[in-house]
């Protein structure tokens, strides 16, 4: 084994010199340059000061503007709540721990931080999958005479929480466990060991296939069908510049959505799978820390892609920030006037 395993921790360094210590009790500066902990803390601070305001503003603006409280927007609000879970429950703890060089909150704190951060991440991940399903259903209408309503939206939100809890509760009750990961300043699922009594192998397989591959397949299928439907509508109205413009915007948006999902989860899932299938191989603390950066950054670019680029949300946010007036209203109206012929296609687009 090219690491040191202890009670509820795994440090990616062989303890041949006797320097390895518990990440719950001692600074881990022997793992990487101490400056790396400062960089980690600064990055967490950056995510907090940008991630919290933009997600909180999303919720506040929705309360302020009744027209935003529509069933199709429920999942976007759920996405903002998920990001706030990550910011409040995960990023603050990681920043505080990085300032000390180790996970200072102990075993209980590791469980709470691992649960909160993973819960937020899983709600966010499943929200993107449900959002893809909702947009596919609304635009492609696979079922005739179907009308998307509040009950369907509530079912979608409930599904995200059910799947997220199905992923995050088991490590608290003995199916796998939360342990410090990477630079030992944040906690996550134990991909590193085959600790006796925790059945890590079965849980990691369950996580990878059910909570990564399934949402990925859903997103590719739904957005693939949606793009086909939009292109067919555009082909039927080739003389309409409006329809062509809407098609380009929807295509751009779908590409952004898929890339956003892959950038967020593919590095983390790939590295976790590699560690799981190559247990005993040598890898440094940064090997898991850097992919986690991508997953955590979703708290910023998810709102930008899915909320701030949504014309209705964007206008309401600007109106709220400018005390009831939108200084860009003329430009927005001029841009939107060219899209009236393609309302069904542009309903999937945030622009």
From Swiss-Prot:
Topology feature Cytoplasmic, residues: 62-73, 134-152, 225-252, 309-351
Location of N6-(retinylidene)lysine modifications: 296
Recorded superkingdom: Eukaryota
GO biological process, one term: visual perception
Compositionally biased region (Low complexity): 335-351
Region of interest (Disordered), residue spans: 330-351
Keyword Transmembrane helix belongs to the record: yes
Gene3D superfamilies: Rhodopsin 7-helix transmembrane proteins
Lipid moiety-binding residues (S-palmitoyl cysteine): 323
Transmembrane segments: 37-61, 74-96, 111-133, 153-173, 203-224, 253-274, 287-308
Disulfide links within the chain: 110-187
CDD domains: 7tmA_MWS_opsin
Name of the protein described by the UniProt record: Rhodopsin
Species annotation: Neoniphon sammara
Organism lineage: Eukaryota, Metazoa, Chordata, Craniata, Vertebrata
Gene expressing this chain: rho
């Amino acid at each position: 084994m090219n690491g040191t395993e202890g009670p509820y921790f795994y440090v990616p360094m062989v303890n041949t010199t006797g320097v390895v210590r518990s990440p719950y009790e001692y600074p881990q500066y022997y793992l990487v340059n101490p400056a790396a902990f400062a960089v980690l803390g600064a990055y967490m601070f950056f995510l907090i000061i940008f991630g919290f305001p933009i997600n909180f503003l999303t919720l506040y603006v929705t309360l302020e503007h009744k027209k935003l409280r529509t069933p199709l927007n429920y999942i976007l609000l759920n996405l903002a709540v998920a990001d706030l879970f990550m910011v409040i429950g995960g990023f603050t703890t990681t920043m505080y721990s990085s300032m000390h060089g180790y996970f200072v909150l102990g075993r209980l704190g590791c469980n709470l931080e691992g649960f909160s951060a993973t819960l937020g991440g899983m709600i966010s991940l499943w929200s993107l999958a449900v959002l893809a399903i909702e947009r596919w259903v609304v635009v492609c209408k696979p079922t005739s005479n179907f009308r998307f309503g509040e009950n369907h939206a509530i079912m979608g939100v409930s599904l995200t929480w059910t799947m997220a809890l199905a992923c995050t509760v088991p490590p608290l009750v003995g199916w796998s466990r939360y342990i410090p990961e990477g630079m030992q300043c944040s906690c996550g699922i134990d991909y590193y060991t085959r600790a006796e009594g925790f059945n890590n192998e079965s849980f990691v397989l369950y996580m990878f296939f059910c909570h990564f591959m399934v949402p990925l397949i859903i997103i590719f299928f739904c957005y693939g069908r949606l793009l086909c439907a939009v292109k067919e509508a555009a082909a039927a109205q080739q003389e309409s510049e409006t329809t062509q413009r809407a098609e380009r915007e929807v295509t751009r948006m779908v590409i952004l959505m898929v890339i956003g999902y892959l950038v967020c989860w593919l590095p983390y899932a790939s590295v976790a799978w590699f560690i799981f299938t190559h247990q005993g191989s040598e890898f440094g603390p940064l090997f898991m820390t850097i992919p986690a950066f991508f997953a955590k950054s979703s708290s910023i670019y998810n709102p930008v892609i899915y909320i701030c680029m949504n014309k209705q949300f964007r206008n309401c946010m600007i109106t709220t920030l400018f005390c009831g007036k939108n200084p860009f209203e003329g430009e927005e109206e001029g841009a939107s006037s060219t899209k009236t012929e393609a309302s069904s296609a542009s309903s999937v687009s945030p622009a």
